[in-house]
Regions:
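Charged interaction scaffolds used for protein-protein
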Residues: 1-32, 51-65, 84-138
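Short, surface-exposed, low-complexity cationic segments
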Residues: 39-57
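Amphipathic alpha-helical interface surfaces
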Residues: 41, 66-74, 109
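Short capping micro-motif at the N-terminus of alpha-helices
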Residues: 35-37
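Short, hydrophobic/amphipathic alpha-helical patches that form generic packing surfaces
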Residues: 69-80, 115-118
Length: 138
């Protein structure tokens, strides 16, 4: 039976993923995390893993990413999606995420992360992850 837990006093509820912003939800160990595709997250992933986001998307499509790489990717997108007052999520550990991904299942998690990475390389969002305005045609 599912328990409906309310946030403790002084803590806000976790934000929900907004697909209009290209966000997705990743559930690890029963906790839902918002994955938000921002330029800051993309730059952190590229710097940490030493490759372009496009190359990482290609590797994801070939199921060629390690657990640690998946933890790094998930961590950057989770930190980008953290609520401003959620210091615990904002400081989430990539190695701990890799362990949780191992427990959850690499293929399941890879599908979700691949969708968010595809949103990064396909564009249509501001660096902060908001949808870009569409110009009206005359």
């Amino acid at each position: 039976m599912a328990v409906n837990r309310k946030p403790r006093a002084g803590r806000s509820a976790r934000p929900k993923a907004n697909p209009v912003r290209g966000e997705a939800t990743l559930t690890l160990a029963g906790v839902e995390y918002v994955l938000r595709p921002t330029s800051e997250a993309a730059f952190a992933i590229e710097e940490e893993l030493g490759g372009s986001m496009l190359l990482l998307v290609q590797r994801a499509g070939s199921v060629a990413l390690s657990y640690r790489e998946l933890g790094t990717i998930a961590g950057a997108f989770i930190r980008a999606g953290a609520a401003p007052d959620d210091k615990l999520t904002a400081n989430i550990n990539d190695d701990a995420l890799a362990d949780l991904i191992y427990a959850e299942g690499q293929v399941k998690v890879l599908g979700i992360l691949s969708a968010v990475m595809a949103n990064v390389v396909n564009g249509g969002y501001t660096p902060q992850g908001e949808p870009r305005a569409v110009a009206e045609t005359p």
